[in-house]
């Protein structure tokens, strides 16, 4: 399991939201590329980027900041937010993004995921965001009647590289991830699951590592590394020690 730092972009700045609410944001950096370099220097292997404006608008909104991050880094990046069609996927991969995350469009149009996986093998990730176990879309503004597990099962056999699972009630709240829901999802499918939302202390990383065998390949952390609750290099060292045991 690896620890993945997150950069959430709003109006070209690096921010964190509470429970996905755009009005409850905290700006952590006016220079996202410089912030990305900090996380790379601390040992990150993969950077998670979210275009928050894009997620709400349904189209890319922070291309300049994203391109600056990609040009600055040597490590792999994965990007989500506002990716709704093959043309956008192709443009981002051409820019140098390592993997793209399809969220809302995956729920509404699973065929897009299948086609994207066929065209760009190993580079397509599905983002599933859930509130009380039910899938939320459109920048978390709309909760559907579909469970996270039922949606995830639709993508079995497509060649999806991973599923990023976010428990919205935990995101940005520093209350710890929903271990049970994450494990249940990972056990229900063969696709690797990346946990997101709520990681607030090294103990949370340890708790996820304890259920890693269920199929959990990574943990995304945002607010905790910006606030200093977690030292990213320590969290990375912890997972590397676990991998060598």
UniProtKB/Swiss-Prot annotation:
Q: Key word Amino-acid biosynthesis present in the record?
A: yes
Instruction: Specify whether Transport is a keyword of the entry.
Output: no
Q: Which GO terms describe its molecular function?
A: 1-(5-phosphoribosyl)-5-[(5-phosphoribosylamino)methylideneamino]imidazole-4-carboxamide isomerase activity
Entry's family note:
Belongs to the HisA/HisF family.
EC id: 5.3.1.16
Q: Which Pfam families match?
A: His_biosynth
- What is the designated name of this protein? 1-(5-phosphoribosyl)-5-[(5-phosphoribosylamino)methylideneamino] imidazole-4-carboxamide isomerase
Q: Where in the cell is it found?
A: Cytoplasm
Pathway it acts in?
Amino-acid biosynthesis; L-histidine biosynthesis; L-histidine from 5-phospho-alpha-D-ribose 1-diphosphate: step 4/9
Supply the gene name.
hisA
Query: GO cellular component annotations, sorted alphabetically?
Result: cytoplasm
Q: Catalyzes what? A: 1-(5-phospho-beta-D-ribosyl)-5-[(5-phospho-beta-D-ribosylamino)methylideneamino]imidazole-4-carboxamide = 5-[(5-phospho-1-deoxy-D-ribulos-1-ylimino)methylamino]-1-(5-phospho-beta-D-ribosyl)imidazole-4-carboxamide
Gene3D superfamilies xrefs: Aldolase class I
Q: What is its main location?
A: cytoplasm
Instruction: Give the positions the UniProt entry annotates as the active site.
Output: 8 (proton acceptor), 129 (proton donor)
């Amino acid at each position: 399991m690896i620890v993945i730092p997150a950069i959430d972009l709003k109006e070209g700045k690096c921010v964190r939201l509470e429970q996905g609410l755009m009005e409850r944001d905290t700006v952590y950096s006016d220079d996202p590329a410089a912030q990305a370099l900090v996380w790379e220097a601390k040992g990150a292997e993969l950077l998670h980027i979210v275009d928050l404006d894009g997620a709400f608008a349904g189209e890319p909104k922070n291309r300049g900041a994203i391109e600056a991050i990609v040009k600055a880094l040597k490590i792999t990046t994965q990007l989500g937010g506002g990716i709704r069609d093959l043309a956008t996927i192709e443009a981002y991969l051409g820019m140098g993004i390592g993997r793209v995350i399809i969220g809302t469009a995956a729920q509404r149009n699973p065929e897009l995921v299948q086609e994207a996986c066929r065209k760009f093998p190993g580079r397509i990730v599905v983002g599933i965001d859930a509130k009380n176990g039910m899938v939320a879309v459109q920048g978390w503004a709309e909760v559907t009647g579909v469970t996270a597990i039922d949606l995830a099962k639709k993508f079995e056999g497509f060649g999806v590289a991973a599923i990023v699972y976010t428990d919205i009630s935990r995101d940005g709240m520093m209350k710890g991830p929903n271990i049970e829901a994450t494990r249940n999802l990972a056990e229900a499918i063969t696709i690797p699951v990346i946990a997101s939302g709520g990681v607030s202390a090294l103990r949370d990383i340890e708790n996820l590592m304890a259920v890693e065998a269920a199929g959990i390949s990574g943990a995304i952390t945002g607010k905790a590394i910006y606030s200093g609750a977690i030292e990213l290099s320590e969290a990375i060292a912890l997972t590397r020690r676990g991998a060598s045991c």
